């Protein structure tokens, strides 16, 4: 029997009603109350997520910037201390190793946050391409990560920190913020389409912060949230999930994150030639939104057709809790990607009518 990995918060899941599942080798809560309730809490109030399964890698040394410029697609030279950047790592053929966040903690000190299912693969990829004076260290087991997301997230977190959180702008962070007296890196980032913060602390401090936030957030309807709501929230906001919208066979351009690919940066990086070609002349496939007109919910890998031609497949799909519609993301042949194009999805051996619609499906009002 495979032993599932657990985060430092595992022991408190049951106290809050957490129902765990095997998520890529991790025993994680899929929900605490219900996916729908948790989803709505984040859209209207706030939700607290344990995302400690995510990986963290420290990159330091005099050549750390040159190294990162070679292995990621975005332009890290534009990042200032206290800034965060979304980027991708690619293979030479343009396929995606992973998508990640980079935090610049010092002139020669970067923290990379990578997907849980890719920790070993990413670390080996990074370590195998180290240049000069660069040190790459996997610190995933030492760091826990919590995410507090939703319109009331700032107000709740503000109750337990002395720093003025309004000073931490979107995709910025502060190191050594005291959260209920515990030092943590606090960044204004997230994976839900809402305002919110991600909190990185020592693994042994995670339970104390989790319980304190739920205690002070109770009057503002803060709910503990699981992976189910995390997935429906990120999906509505059209944020890609590695293994579905991104993979070794899907480039960042096709997945709609071309903004994180800077082919005009001086540094040569893995996949640059292919990605430059796709950026300038278009990629053969495109990730599009689809709305099902008839009955049925599109799910990952369901084939998409126009007539008898298979034009691609669904990458993610659900009954949207916010929009109350059956919607999906699909990677399809670019010639069928125009808005309002009618397509068919094969759901349980039956063709169901759908139409290409704009994304993101959900965008919060400022």
Swiss-Prot record:
Q: Which reactions are catalysed by this chain?
A: N(6)-[(R)-S(8)-aminomethyldihydrolipoyl]-L-lysyl-[protein] + (6S)-5,6,7,8-tetrahydrofolate = N(6)-[(R)-dihydrolipoyl]-L-lysyl-[protein] + (6R)-5,10-methylene-5,6,7,8-tetrahydrofolate + NH4(+)
Give the highest taxon in the source lineage: Bacteria
Which terms in the Gene Ontology molecular function aspect does this entry carry?
aminomethyltransferase activity; transaminase activity
Got a GO cellular component term for this one? cytosol
Q: What class of enzyme is it?
A: transferase
InterPro entries given for it? GCS_T, GCS_T_bac, GCST_C, GCV_T_N, GcvT/YgfZ/DmdA, GcvT/YgfZ_C, TrmE/GcvT_dom1
**Does the keyword field hold Signal?**
no
Q: E.C. number, please?
A: 2.1.2.10
Gene Ontology biological-process annotations: glycine decarboxylation via glycine cleavage system
Is Transferase given among the entry's keywords?
yes
Family annotation (Pfam families): GCV_T (PF01571), GCV_T_C (PF08669)
- Tell me which stretches of the chain form a coiled coil: none
Q: Which UniProt keywords apply?
A: Aminotransferase, Transferase
SUPFAM superfamilies reported in the protein's UniProt record? Aminomethyltransferase beta-barrel domain, Folate-binding domain
PANTHER family, per database record: AMINOMETHYLTRANSFERASE, AMINOMETHYLTRANSFERASE, MITOCHONDRIAL
The task this protein performs is described as: The glycine cleavage system catalyzes the degradation of glycine.
The family classification in the record reads: Belongs to the GcvT family.
Q: How does it assemble?
A: The glycine cleavage system is composed of four proteins: P, T, L and H.
Q: Return the protein name.
A: Aminomethyltransferase
> Which species is listed as the source?
Bacillus cytotoxicus (strain DSM 22905 / CIP 110041 / 391-98 / NVH 391-98)
Q: Which gene encodes it?
A: gcvT
């Amino acid at each position: 029997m495979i032993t599932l990995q657990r985060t430092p918060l595992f022991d408190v899941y049951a106290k809050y009603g957490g129902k765990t599942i095997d998520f890529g080798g991790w025993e994680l809560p899929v929900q605490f109350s219900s996916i729908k309730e948790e989803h709505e809490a984040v859209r209207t109030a706030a939700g607290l997520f344990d995302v400690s399964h995510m990986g963290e890698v420290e990159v330091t040394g005099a050549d750390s910037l040159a190294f990162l410029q070679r292995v990621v697609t975005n332009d890290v030279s534009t990042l200032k201390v206290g800034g965060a950047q979304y980027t991708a790592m690619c293979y030479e053929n343009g396929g995606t190793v992973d998508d990640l966040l980079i935090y610049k903690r010092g002139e020669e000190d970067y923290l990379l946050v990578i997907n849980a299912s890719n920790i070993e693969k990413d670390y080996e990829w990074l370590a195998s391409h180290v240049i000069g004076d660069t040190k790459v260290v996997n610190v995933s087991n030492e760091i826990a990560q919590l995410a507090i997301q939703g319109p009331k997230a700032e107000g709740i977190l503000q109750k337990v920190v002395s720093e003025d959180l309004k000073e931490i702008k979107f995709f910025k962070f502060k190191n050594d913020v005291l959260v209920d007296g515990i030092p943590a890196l606090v960044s204004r980032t997230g994976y839900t389409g809402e305002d919110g913060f991600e909190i990185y602390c020592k693994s042994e401090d995670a339970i104390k912060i989790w319980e304190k936030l739920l205690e002070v957030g109770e009057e503002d309807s803060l709910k503990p949230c699981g992976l189910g709501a995390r997935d429906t929230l990120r999906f509505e906001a059209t944020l890609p999930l590695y293994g579905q919208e991104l993979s070794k066979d899907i480039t960042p351009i096709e997945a709609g994150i071309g903004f994180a690919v800077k082919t005009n940066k001086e540094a040569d990086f893995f996949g640059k030639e292919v990605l430059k070609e796709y950026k300038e002349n278009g990629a053969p496939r495109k990730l599009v939104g689809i709305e099902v007109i008839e009955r049925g919910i599109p799910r990952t890998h369901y084939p998409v057709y126009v007539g008898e031609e298979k034009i691609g497949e669904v990458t993610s799909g659900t009954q949207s809790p916010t929009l109350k519609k059956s919607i999906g993301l699909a990677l399809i042949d670019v010639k069928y990607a125009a808005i309002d194009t009618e397509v068919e999805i094969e759901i349980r051996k039956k063709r169901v009518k759908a139409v290409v619609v704009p994304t993101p499906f959900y965008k919060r009002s400022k």
